[in-house]
């Protein structure tokens, strides 16, 4: 019985060894599958999907690159901001000798520097990346013994002048001369230069004592006192001197107090025994303060605000119409990228207040002894004494702050993602610190020259000044 069961289970089986009959030149595993056409590889089924993935990656890369370029262009176009930095900056080039304070301008694609030698005042255009001289033009003689001082200036709003450089060259009068020479009217020559090649495009004079002279667009606004103490203000073409508009104050401005004039686009503020605010575009009177009222004014995005000891602060529309009361004047920021267009920041000294631009409604209030400096990317950079930091502009929360253990020699800047502020090395030497705008994490520290006086953003470029040198970093 057992033998039959065993015999039933044990059957003869023949095994065909295909490897014996297969050609020696081909491995059995190399045979194409029976159910696929010859020449059709399985991976080919997936090539359309792979192509789509590659296209998506390329598109994403191109989109990110476009966003980066757009971000760089947007930040670079904001006066007072530094062009976004890819790494810690290093000195690119420098100009030694006597350069007028503030006399570096962004003109077209060049950096223009006003400097004084022993013989002359000279305007020189440099390539921002290399410092190579593009052109140089003498504009006036240096100060000489026996003559009045001849300090040349080239005014600008926010350091950018576009295609036209305007320089103001005093014509010094002889000192210790005869009475006729002493009584000669002061004369100031306006020298317009093409930013492209330095070509002098004209010349015209301003005669008489000047209370103030400032640039707006390609024009100059000039304030002068009349013999009876009234203030005469003219807006004149920077190229030709042609008068755009003219205004004379109805009351004397300088009988008991010194008169002054400031251009704060879109307004011109005349100060003295009374305060008068003009429209910078056409010279219309927008506000006329009472005599000795102590009226102050500050511009804000096409509008302006006023403050007086009696009556407090008010926001005004562009035509001078009073809109609403305010707790104080709006903070004057060194840079504003427009990321909070409907917000007004007011500095009350011990507190910062955010108001709705349209209605004046208070949005938030936070205790802070620091002053607002820069508004960028919905963040408010603040500083004061030896401290600087960042607030969230949407709610006033402090995001971070740092104490440098020393008085700030210059105010912090930003490149849109970093705060570039002053600091000290462990051995007490000046440094430029870069901290993340969002959280204050320190990325790098760059040594600065001893006796650094200013660190500024000019046309997006980082400019460091000492008493004797002007150094461009990048």
Predicted ranges, named:
Residues 2-474:
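Secretory-pathway ectodomains
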């Amino acid at each position: 019985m057992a033998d039959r069961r065993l015999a039933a289970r044990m059957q003869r089986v023949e095994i065909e060894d295909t490897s014996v009959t297969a050609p020696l030149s081909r491995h059995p595993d190399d045979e194409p599958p029976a159910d696929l056409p010859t020449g059709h590889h399985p991976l080919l089924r997936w090539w359309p999907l792979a192509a789509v993935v590659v296209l998506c990656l390329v598109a994403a890369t191109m989109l990110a690159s476009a966003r980066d370029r757009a971000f760089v262009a947007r930040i670079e176009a904001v006066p007072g901001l530094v062009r976004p930095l890819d790494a810690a900056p290093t000195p690119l080039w420098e100009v030694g000798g006597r350069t007028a304070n503030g006399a570096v301008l962004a003109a077209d694609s060049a950096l223009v520097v006003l400097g004084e030698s022993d013989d002359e005042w000279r305007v020189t255009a440099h390539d921002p990346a290399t410092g190579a001289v593009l052109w140089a033009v003498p504009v006036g003689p240096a100060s000489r013994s026996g003559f009045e001082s001849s300090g040349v200036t080239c005014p600008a709003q926010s350091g950018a002048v576009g295609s036209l450089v305007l320089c103001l060259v005093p014509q010094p009068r002889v000192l210790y001369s005869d009475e006729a020479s002493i009584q000669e009217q002061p004369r100031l020559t306006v020298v317009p230069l093409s930013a492209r090649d330095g070509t002098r495009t004209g010349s015209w004079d301003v005669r008489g004592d000047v209370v103030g002279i400032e640039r707006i667009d390609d024009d100059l606004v000039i304030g002068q006192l009349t013999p009876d103490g009234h203030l005469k203000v003219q807006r004149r073409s920077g190229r030709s001197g042609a008068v755009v508009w003219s205004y004379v104050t109805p009351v004397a401005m300088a009988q008991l107090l010194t008169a002054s004039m400031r251009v704060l686009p879109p307004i011109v503020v005349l100060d003295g025994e009374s305060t008068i605010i003009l429209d910078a575009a056409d010279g219309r009177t927008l506000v006329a303060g009472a005599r000795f009222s102590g009226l102050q004014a500050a511009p804000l995005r096409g509008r302006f605000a006023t403050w007086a000891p009696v009556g407090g602060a008010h926001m005004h529309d562009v035509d001078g119409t009073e809109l609403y009361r305010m707790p104080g004047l709006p903070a004057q920021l060194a840079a504003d990228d427009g990321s909070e267009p409907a917000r007004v920041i007011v500095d009350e000294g011990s507190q910062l207040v955010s108001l709705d631009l349209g209605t004046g409604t208070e949005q938030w209030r936070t205790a802070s002894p620091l002053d607002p400096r820069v508004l960028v990317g919905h963040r408010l950079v603040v500083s004061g004494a030896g401290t600087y930091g960042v607030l969230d502009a949407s709610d006033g929360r402090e995001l971070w702050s740092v104490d440098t253990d020393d008085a700030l020699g210059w105010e912090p800047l930003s490149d849109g993602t970093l705060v570039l502020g002053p600091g000290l090395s462990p051995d007490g030497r000046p440094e430029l610190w870069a901290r993340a705008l969002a959280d204050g994490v320190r990325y790098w520290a760059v040594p600065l020259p001893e006796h650094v006086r200013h660190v500024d953003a000019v046309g997006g470029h980082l400019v460091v000044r000492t008493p004797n040198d002007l150094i461009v970093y990048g």
